Amino acid sequence: MDKILSGKTVAIDIKGQIKSYTEELKASGKSLKISSILVGDDGGSVYYQNFQEKLANNLGIDFEKIKLDESISEENLKLKIEELNKDDSVNGIMLLLPLPKHIDERVVTNLIDADKDLDCLSEVSVGRFYKGEKCFMPCTPNSVITLLKAYNIEIEGKEVVIIGRSNIVGKPLFQMFLNENATVTVCHSKTKNLKEVCKRADILVVAIGRANFIDSSYVREGAVVIDVGTSEVNGKITGDVNFDDVYEKASLITPVPGGVGSLTTTLLLKNVCKELD
């Protein structure tokens, strides 16, 4: 039995939906445009922005790559965001993080128009999300839910344990599982008896950024294991879960790479295709 939950496979289907949608738009004389802002030259952010651009172009979405010098003032960055907010040709705005230390990330992200905030970064966007109002979904948590649903894994009534409480993954994912009527426990560095808590999980999600931290002793027989973590070990990308050790015990498991991460950028681009929600 194949136990692999492949984000790559699910992404192929979603890319097809996006491509069909943008082709229909262009046939009617319309188009979609995303503006992506990079401040400085962080290697990871440069790579990610280039990857975003390539995927967007392949899917028929216009992509504006904005590179700003690391020394740019906070005021000038704010002016650039306000300019994009007012530009009706721009359907979505992405601001790559982290920002240089002299720029207040909270102030700047809060300037992004919530109707264009593809990454759900601003406090208005986050407020809409937690109140259940219409907004762009946080992409990594959305990737987890999308992957489970694509494989027809029942969520309602299930016991879900999330290890990690970050604002980017753990907390919004907690809310999304609640919305699916799961019973959810969030674990963190102060959680006592972590193994015992994890062993209760029908669905175990790990998002802590510690390579190979979770082994089979944390997993109940037949659990679904979702690995959100990515770390570099000896030049290779590795997840938070010791894949080889956990594989036999899990009923289904995501690989790293090839799992959740394979979906995130695709879903980010899908965010701008509002009619596909």
Swiss-Prot record:
It comes from Clostridium perfringens (strain SM101 / Type A). InterPro entries: Aminoacid_DH-like_N_sf, NAD(P)-bd_dom_sf, THF_DH/CycHdrlase, THF_DH/CycHdrlase_cat_dom, THF_DH/CycHdrlase_NAD-bd_dom. Homodimer. This is Bifunctional protein FolD. It catalyses: (6R)-5,10-methylene-5,6,7,8-tetrahydrofolate + NADP(+) = (6R)-5,10-methenyltetrahydrofolate + NADPH; (6R)-5,10-methenyltetrahydrofolate + H2O = (6R)-10-formyltetrahydrofolate + H(+). Catalyzes the oxidation of 5,10-methylenetetrahydrofolate to 5,10-methenyltetrahydrofolate and then the hydrolysis of 5,10-methenyltetrahydrofolate to 10-formyltetrahydrofolate. GO terms for cellular component: cytosol. The lineage of its organism: Bacteria, Bacillati, Bacillota, Clostridia, Eubacteriales. One of its GO terms (molecular function) is methylenetetrahydrofolate dehydrogenase (NADP+) activity. It holds the Pfam family THF_DHG_CYH. Pathway: One-carbon metabolism; tetrahydrofolate interconversion.
